[in-house]
Curated annotation (Swiss-Prot):
Its EC number is 4.2.1.20. The alpha subunit is responsible for the aldol cleavage of indoleglycerol phosphate to indole and glyceraldehyde 3-phosphate. It holds the Pfam family Trp_syntA. PANTHER family: TRYPTOPHAN SYNTHASE ALPHA CHAIN, CHLOROPLASTIC, TRYPTOPHAN SYNTHASE, ALPHA CHAIN. It comes from the Bacteria. Belongs to the TrpA family. It is an enzyme of class 4 (lyase). Keywords: Amino-acid biosynthesis, Aromatic amino acid biosynthesis, Lyase, Tryptophan biosynthesis. This is Tryptophan synthase alpha chain. Pathway: Amino-acid biosynthesis; L-tryptophan biosynthesis; L-tryptophan from chorismate: step 5/5. The active site is at E49 (proton acceptor), D60 (proton acceptor). It catalyses: (1S,2R)-1-C-(indol-3-yl)glycerol 3-phosphate + L-serine = D-glyceraldehyde 3-phosphate + L-tryptophan + H2O. The gene is trpA. One of its GO terms (cellular component) is cytosol.
Amino acid sequence: MTSVSERFRSLKQAGQCALIPFITAGDPDLETTEQALKILDAAGADFIELGVPYSDPLADGPTIQAAATRALSRGVTLEQVLAIVQRVHGQLTAPIILFTYYNPIFYRGIDAFMAQVAAAGVKGLVIPDLPLEESQMVLDAATSHGLDLILLVAPTSPTERIEAIAKASQGFIYLVSVTGVTGARTSVASRVGELLPKLRQVTDKPIGVGFGVSDPAQARQLKEWGADGVIVGSAVVKRLATGTPAEGLAAVKEFCESLKEAIA
């Protein structure tokens, strides 16, 4: 797989908007997670966000929280998640971006964690509870192991903070479309249409928009507003958890294909 930055560069040269689906590792089970990574890749995902289940996921809405709770109840560990990445990453076109909270990183040791996930084949990291002020040590460790640390910009961030985050973020900038937690919503916040040009004034890095995208029409709207990537989480997780694992995988495949078509 190519790095996050390189992949975005090739997409931009082709005039394409990136599709970035999210799934929670271990929900409904580890075997389905492994299959889902392959199915999402085949269905057109340009990157795949893989969430490590965590007991106190402050940024996540009810759908992803419930998925994490189910995975943890089955005893899913980071080591099991990385074992899946190790097995499948070489078969995928889409780089895998690990979505994890900071505590597991701190617990293992920052450099040791980065070495472990990089060795497994992870290409990027999103750490939603890592504030900019405390990110330099994590950023340095990620860089030393060839990982892109993707930082989040909130819609309420003042201009100075937006500039600082945009400068520090690697791979792309994760623009949070709404205040609050993740979760599918019936419409995309119109403020995103105002925030994208504001970000463009301070950076030429790719911008991915997430939190609340639930259908192809919303994905298309974000592309029209100028997003370089569209991140879809809860709507994918919900489909994967519906019915039997086979039914969930089929639903995710169909949904991902419809999203890809919408932003083509």
